């Protein structure tokens, strides 16, 4: 069982394969050249226990054995991987996506992203669909390591920015075929921009940029969004969809969605 996830912006199209971990044995043969996978890895301790019980090896070992890891594969969470699994990720140059708020919500712990970054691994910042407000994800990424380790010195703001800005841009550049031009204002880069209405109360410079964002920015400051040169939001008004109509339709259909959900839960017992 496998689903094909199409990511598209105008003529930018790439595919990553998302699949259930139990179907690993057929994945290597199914993977076309130049494509990668997206999979959750060791989000909870139970994932590792289940893998050891059923297959006699840890989750990361199984992915490594079946050729799933690689420089075009994204592994989300990686909270409970051990040293050997970490070495597999590093050896294969696999992407790691840190999901702080999702991990907090599910009370599963936190990935050791500081040591991964120090070791030169490709750690990005995601949100597991929690919300689409990535600046709040910056904040939680900054705070979570301090709480987990009970040490206010943990998780430097520059490390948060490295994950969220530089590494995310590198991953997007690879996925959409723009290389190191993604996330930059340079010739031939994609025209993807947001305008932020931010009025700093103190000096705003490279020495405090991560903390200005972490403590001072919010999604409500975004006034305009441009994707591939096209305004998707202008002066805080969406240009391509009728927001009121979408909201009204959502209110209309959500009771049916919930009814199907409860019907499924009742069948599963």
Roles of regions detected by a PLM:
Residues 165-269:
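Active-site microenvironment of metallo-dependent hydrolases
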Residues 75-77, 98-101, 125-127, 196, ...:
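Thr-Gly-centered strand-to-loop micro-motif
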Residues 43, 100-105, 128-130:
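Short, acidic/turn-prone active-site loops that include or flank metal/cofactor-
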Residues 50-51, 109-111, 136-139, 208-209:
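Short secondary-structure transition/capping segments
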Residues 81-82, 104, 131, 202:
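Glycine-rich nucleotide phosphate-binding loop and flanking beta-alpha elements
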């Amino acid at each position: 069982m496998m689903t094909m996830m199409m990511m598209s912006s105008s003529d930018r199209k790439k595919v990553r394969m998302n699949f259930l971990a139990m179907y690993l044995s057929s994945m290597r043969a199914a993977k076309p050249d130049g494509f990668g996978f997206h999979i959750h890895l060791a989000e909870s301790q139970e994932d590792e226990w289940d893998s050891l019980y059923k297959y006699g090896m840890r989750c990361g070992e199984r992915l490594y054995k079946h050729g799933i890891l690689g420089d075009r594969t994204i592994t989300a969470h990686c909270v409970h991987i051990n040293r050997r699994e970490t070495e597999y990720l590093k050896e294969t140059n696999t992407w790691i996506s840190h999901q702080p708020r999702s991990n907090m919500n599910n009370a599963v712990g936190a990935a050791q992203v500081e040591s991964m970054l120090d070791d030169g691994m490709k750690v990005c910042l995601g949100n597991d669909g929690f919300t689409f407000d990535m600046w709040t994800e910056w904040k939680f990424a900054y705070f979570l390591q301090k709480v987990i380790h009970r040490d206010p010195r943990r998780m430097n703001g520059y490390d948060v920015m490295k994950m969220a800005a530089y590494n995310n841009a590198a991953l997007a550049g690879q996925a959409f075929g723009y290389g190191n031009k993604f996330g930059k204002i340079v010739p031939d880069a994609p025209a993807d921009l947001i305008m932020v209405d931010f009025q700093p109360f103190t000096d705003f410079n490279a020495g405090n940029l991560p903390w200005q964002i972490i403590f001072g920015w919010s999604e409500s400051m975004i006034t305009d969004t441009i994707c591939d040169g096209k305004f998707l939001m202008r002066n805080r008004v969406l240009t391509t969809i009728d927001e009121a109509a979408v909201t009204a339709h959502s209110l209309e259909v959500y009771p049916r969605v919930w009814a199907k959900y409860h019907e499924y839960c009742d069948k599963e017992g």
